[in-house]
A protein has these predicted regions:
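Carbohydrate-recognition loop of C-type lectin domains
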Residues: 2-120, 176-177
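An aromatic-glycine-centered, glycine-rich loop/turn in mixed alpha/beta architecture
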Residues: 78, 97-177
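Short acidic amphipathic segments
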Residues: 1-16, 89, 127-146
Length: 177
């Protein structure tokens, strides 16, 4: 699946047991692919071409794929759901802080958070690395994060098994003290 054009990430949950899993919700003896990017029909074909016989794929996106006899088989998978992230950052600057410093900090945070995978949590303390590596001439005096436009959190953000972090520079507020 990862070799397909446009596919950026894939996570596959497998259930080899006789009992359905609750979270992630994987029926017994099946697998649950979650795919970011790519064309639905190509993804379904790749799953069909590589899945074991008699094992069902699971998900809310279902497409028919023809076997060598022309018989259609339902192939299922999911797409990750975007989880918006908002950051409010308060910094104190000195005379060496560049005029584009705010943009550099925002870009560094967007670059870092865009590397997180499907279901990968946002770890609060790790945000300081891209912030501090963006430029010099400042220090962070406060930071809050969250999933709404007025973030108040100072702890990690849990990302569910089928979610992916969605961040843009406009979701990052930089204030000065």
């Amino acid at each position: 699946i990862l070799k397909l054009d446009g596919v950026q990430q894939v996570v596959i949950y497998e259930n080899e047991t006789d009992t359905a899993f609750v979270s992630p919700p994987v029926p017994a003896h099946s697998f649950y692919p979650i795919v970011l990017g790519g064309i639905t029909t190509e993804i379904a074909q790749a799953i069909w071409d590589n899945k074991p016989a008699g094992i069902l794929s699971y998900g809310t996106v279902t497409t028919g794929v023809a076997d060598s006899q022309g018989i259609l088989h339902d192939i299922s998978f999911d797409r990750p759901t975007d989880l918006p992230i908002y950051i409010s950052l308060t910094i104190s600057v000195d005379s060496s802080f560049p005029t584009d410093g705010e943009d550099l900090i925002r870009a560094s945070l967007v670059d870092y958070l865009s590397t997180l995978g499907i279901g990968e949590d946002v770890l609060y303390s790790r945000l300081y690395t891209p912030i501090n590596s963006a430029t010099g001439g400042f220090y962070v005096s406060g930071m809050t994060i969250g999933t709404s436009a007025a973030p108040v959190g100072t702890s990690n953000i849990s990302v569910d098994y089928n979610e992916i972090v969605n961040i843009s520079a406009s979701n990052i507020l930089v204030s000065f003290v």
